[in-house]
Amino acid sequence: GLDDWYEPHIKEWSKKATALTTLWFWNTEVGWATVHPILEKYGWKYVSCCVWDKGMSHVAGNTNTKTIRHLPVVTEVCVQYVKEPFFYVENKAMKMKEWLRYEWERTGLPFSKTNEACGVVNAATRKYFTKCHLWYMPPAEAFEKITNYANSYGAEDGKPYFSIDGERPIKRDEWERLRAKFYCPIGVTNVWKEPQLRNTERLKVNQKAIHLNQKPLSLIKRIIEMTTDEGDVVWDPFAGLCTTAIASMDLKRECYSAEKNEDVYKVANKRVREHKKKEE
């Protein structure tokens, strides 16, 4: 099945992924549902499901709903995942939420002192050290305050606290790299109303589309801008016509692409080279 086909690919992606990595998974609704357990198996955490609504123009005029017995399908999904960091304590893997509480408990200090450390009334206990679903990762500034307080006032025999290597606490910039980037564009939701490709953007040979699954450049640029910065690496293992590479060039990202269909590769290679010449 589709899950078996994807698993070796996901296994290899996961070896190189870090907590800064965002994975955008394009597929049909049922395709995504089939592969989702494999993504979870290799440590990918679901964030959100974005729906590409291609609109009524995507529906063929001769669609016979009496025959197909369902509504016309005009959507694809693009699902956002991040690589969740784990912390290892005596060979036990802990998620960040559990590890933060574990480290503070080692200090011997009451949890109420986390508020004092952060200079807040109760935000630290309500947000950063809660056991419930309202938990979220402390910002780097708050984490730095928590770490400094713990290592200043915590029990001497447990120091250093909030350390990965047992030698020193995690630094502020290191903590920032334990969460994937995300920049939310104003006015954009998880439903993307964008027509199917037409005109010059749709690459054709003899009036026939070269790649039936070519994505709009605007949508690829959107997901790159939301989760990367200039100079970051973008990897597209199923590159097709290299729309991701084109978007990355425009956005000053470093893109690596792979495509095994020789005919599609030749067109994609030409497309990238011509686009690069325009930029020079």
Regions found by a protein language model. Give the residues of each.
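Short, conserved SAM-binding/catalytic segment
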Residues: N269-E280
